[in-house]
Amino acid sequence: MGLSDGEWQLVLNVWGKVEADIPGHGQEVLIRLFKGHPETLEKFDKFKHLKSEDEMKASEDLKKHGATVLTALGGILKKKGHHEAEIKPLAQSHATKHKIPVKYLEFISECIIQVLHSKHPGDFGADAQGAMNKALELFRKDMASNYKELGFQG
């Protein structure tokens, strides 16, 4: 399940492109998530009122939250699989406070892949997509494992 050094390099190379515009990427990821999986919007009290894509694009709070999500994910990816210290508090809050099911982590992972592919096609070919899929799968697996320890069946 682990990634090779070369795969991690592919992940981190494209992540460098994300970091050039974290708020823009984060906003686009969340908009794709909410439009493609409207049920996920119910977990976000401060975004529930946003019905149209235009309203979502105009929301500074949504942009800020997108930046928070991708900043946290970037910190995890940079650990190259040695991310237990970063995952534990994230799993704790997502299991006990926010009650975010693992399925929703799958949904947002798909959205991240889609956004990277649309924004960076030259830097996100099949090899990079495969590596990012593996990295996000590792993240989800470790989140799910922590959820289980916390007794959350999400």
UniProtKB/Swiss-Prot annotation:
InterPro entries: Globin (IPR000971), Globin-like_sf (IPR009050), Myoglobin (IPR002335). It is an enzyme of class 1 (oxidoreductase). Nitrite binds at residue 65. Its main location: cytoplasm. GO terms for biological process: oxygen transport; removal of superoxide radicals. Monomeric. This is Myoglobin. It comes from Pan troglodytes.
